[in-house]
């Protein structure tokens, strides 16, 4: 933590967590900028039209949020956004705006894969004027970042630009433009640009963002000044750097921003529900339901609009298990018996691995049972039994529980039971999702109970992928299961 005044930071927030996070940041003394109309209606406060020091946007899968901005602001936001015991976060290895000399490792039909040193990015052929081949070095900039748990890759471009939130400098000549649908506001802003007394450097053109149409002259001047300084700094770095073609390995050249990704687990979503409930009508499990599906999200909005202030918003237990209507949600949106449901196995390092899909064989008020027929090859982890074609795995996931059992069977024989300790399980319509906490408890076919992989949990703590409170919870759950089994 830098100890900077929170009021010196401004955040732009978008996505399903916006109301909750607006409450969170305002309570911490931050400025919230470029607020949407629903947010302006819900909060009795003035929202400044100034350049954000960070943006916080919900990921496309609604699993969490990505934060991009100045390193100091990102660090301070990280402390705020760790809202629950099952919030996990990871540094963005390739923040938006980073300039890197990368190596082409593969070409696809419409683009190329580029080794950035820290991860692999994707360069669409439309984003480069030059033909690229495997093995070549290319200078690229990160346009869009990607959460570590998704299959997406950072989106790259060979055009290098700079941006300060309100003002972007493009590497081309021309008059200023405004990225807005409000033609009158755009004309006014273009006219005001000449009065700022700040000119774009040679070879750069000004493009204002829509939020700039509501900003004061002082704010516009400050944003443009910072963009000019950033462009001059970047130009100096690139002038001093050898051509990308002269390098043999990926090399980072420029990064004004930092980034961080936040995975919200089930308990964290209920904390966010509470923040949102302090502002407006919020059903139990609001964020949990919205994460599941588009149709479910629309259903929540409708229910809250119909209930309005008549909804008390009271919850009867700490984590919301008693008040979250899982069976009602599952009846409406799934999963149902016969459905195929994927097992989304999150890892503490940020990856999300599919363990395959299973058929729903049973579903009650709080749990889903999946059955998978397995193929032969290898052995069952920790059971030391060869895997054969036709073996059956039966897994029961209870919504909100910190563990789940998988029973492995061959014909009528039980080979063993593998109990995975994880963050509270969420049973969505198409997938079950959680983060594996490494330590597991095994019950062998002969009745012997064994606890495994404590060392992997310790390694995750040492790597700062799992915080100590979460690790201690995992150990406690494992100890209780050892006794119970």
Residue positions per predicted region:
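Short cationic amphipathic helices and targeting signals
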Residues: 9-13, 61-69, 177-178, 206-208
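Single-stranded RNA-binding surfaces
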Residues: 70-72, 86-350, 359
């Amino acid at each position: 933590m830098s100890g900077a005044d929170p009021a010196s930071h401004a955040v732009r927030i978008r996505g399903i967590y916006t109301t909750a996070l607006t409450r969170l940041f305002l309570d911490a003394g931050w400025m919230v900028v470029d607020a949407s109309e629903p947010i302006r209606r819900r909060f009795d406060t003035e929202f400044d039209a100034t350049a954000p020091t960070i943006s916080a946007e919900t990921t496309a899968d609604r699993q969490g949020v990505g934060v991009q901005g100045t390193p100091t602001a990102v660090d301070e936001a990280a402390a705020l956004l760790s809202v629950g015991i099952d919030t996990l976060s990871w540094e963005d290895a390739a923040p938006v705006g980073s300039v890197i000399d990368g190596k082409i490792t593969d070409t696809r039909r419409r683009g190329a894969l580029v080794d950035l040193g820290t991860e692999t990015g994707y360069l669409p052929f439309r984003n480069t004027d030059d033909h690229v081949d495997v093995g070549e070095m290319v200078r690229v900039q990160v346009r869009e970042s990607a959460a570590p748990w998704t299959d997406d890759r950072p989106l790259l471009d060979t055009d290098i630009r700079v941006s300060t939130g309100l003002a972007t400098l493009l590497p081309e000549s021309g008059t200023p433009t405004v990225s807005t649908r409000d033609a009158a506001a755009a004309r006014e802003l273009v006219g005001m640009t000449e009065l700022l007394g700040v000119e774009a450097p040679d070879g750069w053109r000004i493009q204002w963002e829509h939020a700039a149409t509501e900003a004061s002259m002082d704010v516009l001047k400050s944003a443009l000044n910072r963009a000019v300084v950033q462009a001059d700094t970047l130009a100096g770095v690139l002038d001093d750097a050898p051509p990308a073609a002269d390098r043999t390995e990926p090399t980072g050249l420029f990064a004004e921003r930092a980034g961080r990704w936040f995975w919200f687990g089930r308990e964290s979503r209920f904390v966010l529900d509470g923040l949102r409930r302090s502002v407006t009508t919020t059903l139990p499990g609001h964020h949990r339901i919205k994460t599941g599906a588009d149709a479910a999200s629309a259903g929540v909005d409708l229910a809250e609009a119909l209930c309005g202030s008549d909804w008390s918003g009271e919850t009867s237990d700490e984590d919301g298990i008693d008040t979250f209507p899982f069976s009602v949600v599952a009846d409406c949106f799934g999963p149902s018996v016969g459905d195929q449901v994927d097992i989304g196995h999150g890892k503490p390092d940020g990856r999300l691995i599919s363990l395959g899909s299973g058929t729903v064989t049973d579903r009650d008020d709080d749990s889903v049972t999946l059955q998978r027929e397995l193929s032969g090859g290898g052995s069952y982890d920790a059971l030391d039994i060869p895997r054969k074609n036709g073996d059956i795995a039966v897994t029961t996931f209870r919504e909100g529980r910190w563990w789940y059992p998988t029973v492995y069977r061959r014909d009528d024989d039980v080979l063993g039971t593998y109990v995975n300790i994880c963050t509270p399980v969420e049973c969505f319509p198409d997938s079950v999702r959680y983060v594996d906490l490494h330590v597991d408890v095994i019950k062998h076919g002969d009745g012997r109970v064994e606890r495994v992989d404590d060392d992997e949990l310790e390694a995750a703590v040492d790597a700062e992928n799992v915080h100590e409170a979460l690790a201690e919870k995992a150990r406690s759950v494992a100890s209780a299961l050892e006794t119970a089994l």
